[in-house]
Amino acid sequence: MAKLTKRMRTIREKVDATKQYDINEAVVLLKELATAKFVESVDVAVNLGIDARKSDQNVRGATVLPHGTGRSVRVAVFTQGANAEAAKAAGAELVGMEDLAELVKKGEMDFDVVIASPDAMRVVGQLGQILGPRGLMPNPKVGTVTPNVAEAVQNAKAGQVRYRNDKNGIIHTTIGKVDFDADKLKENLEALLVALKKGKPSSAKGIYIKKVSLSTTMGAGVAIDQSGLNASA
């Protein structure tokens, strides 16, 4: 058997894998276990009661967290004309059409989010093999293909998270940093759960939000007691 690292031994000693923790208790625990030399993110895994093999039960969307994610986000926007000026005014770092596409083709992708107006998709569509595998391809389902690019830029800058379930029906995303106080992390988590509930597939039966776990970038998962959350859709 592989020898446990000191970090893993500490986690095993402090985290009860059979327990669901109150959100405030969980945050205290996460802070104790966050010993990396950088400010770790707080990530969430939400197990959904869906059959991920069925396309009509897949969950995908986006929501703006009330307290953001703690990350600074660089935004690229494919658009032109008045929309280009609006995107720049909203804070987009890169705005263009064919010129921006050429940068992407060269591998110059110093951005975290890509937004496009509908008329720009003829250009963006040619970049699918580059942007797609990186999770950067604009999509109307998450609000990144939109005629209102300025609003989309503002949302991205304000701490919007995009999510989609994996093949096991689990949503993975970030709800902040470990140096956020417990109330901010709680409210961000509640906002995410409300958005997930609003997007519940009509064909999904039984318990929808089956399990919620929080972890830091380098830490173990801590199961959350949902009864202490205000997440009514």
Curated annotation (Swiss-Prot):
InterPro entries: Ribosom_uL1_bac-type, Ribosomal_uL1, Ribosomal_uL1-like, Ribosomal_uL1/biogenesis, Ribosomal_uL1_3-a/b-sand, Ribosomal_uL1_CS. Keywords: Repressor, Ribonucleoprotein, Ribosomal protein, RNA-binding, rRNA-binding, Translation regulation, tRNA-binding. It comes from the Bacteria. One of its GO terms (biological process) is translation. One of its GO terms (molecular function) is structural constituent of ribosome. Disulfide bonds: none annotated. GO terms for cellular component: cytosolic large ribosomal subunit. It holds the Pfam family Ribosomal_L1. Part of the 50S ribosomal subunit. Binds directly to 23S rRNA. The L1 stalk is quite mobile in the ribosome, and is involved in E site tRNA release. NCBIfam families: rplA_bact. Belongs to the universal ribosomal protein uL1 family. This is Large ribosomal subunit protein uL1.
